[in-house]
């Protein structure tokens, strides 16, 4: 998800969803609608899935706008071009354990601004300028236990729903057909 602010009241929000490294949804703040893309078009997710994704991403957009405002205030930054990028999700490991992640990038820095470790729960400062935000969020921001629940429970439930649909997609495909033609070539003839 990315939010950019180029002047007061004018911002852009874009979220892309990936499943198994393939894009399956796109949401932008202008249309305020989650739409299937790529793999999502092939998956039979149903209208209620896209309505739920739209509702969830509208809330994520609101949260990112609030986070960007807080970060800009803590950094003493006003008008101008600013961006906040959030990468969050969960991965189902081979042993069926879940790895959740949430990384924030601010103003196109080459490194993360803040990261969340779902094992130990704290926000980790990736740059010294993020320390003020970390302290603010530890007292007033997203509670670590709720973030962990989102990454390990809510996200995993969504992952299982998509996985079930994806498996159905694979099961409903016809097996590939191959035609082989063989002819004898006599030596010296083509």
Enumerate the language-model features and the residues they cover.
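Extracellular/lumenal regions of secretory-pathway proteins
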Residues: 1-190
């Amino acid at each position: 998800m990315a939010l950019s602010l180029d002047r007061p009241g004018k911002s852009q929000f874009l979220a892309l969803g990936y499943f198994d490294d393939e894009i399956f949804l796109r949401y932008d703040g202008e249309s305020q609608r989650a739409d299937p893309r790529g793999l999502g078009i092939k998956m039979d997710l149903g209208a209620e899935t896209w309505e739920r994704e739209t509702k969830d991403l509208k809330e994520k957009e609101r949260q990112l706008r609030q986070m960007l405002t807080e970060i800009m205030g803590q950094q003493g930054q006003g008008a101008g071009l600013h961006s906040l990028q959030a990468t969050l999700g969960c991965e189902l490991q081979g042993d069926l354990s879940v790895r959740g992640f949430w990384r924030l990038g601010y103003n196109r820095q080459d490194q993360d601004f803040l990261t969340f470790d779902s094992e130990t729960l704290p926000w980790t400062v990736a740059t010294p300028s993020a320390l003020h935000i970390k302290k603010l969020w530890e007292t007033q921001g997203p509670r670590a236990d709720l973030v962990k629940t989102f990454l390990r429970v809510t996200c995993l439930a969504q992952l299982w729903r998509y996985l079930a649909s994806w498996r159905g997609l694979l099961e409903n495909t016809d097996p590939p057909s191959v035609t082989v033609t063989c002819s004898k070539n006599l030596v010296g003839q083509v």
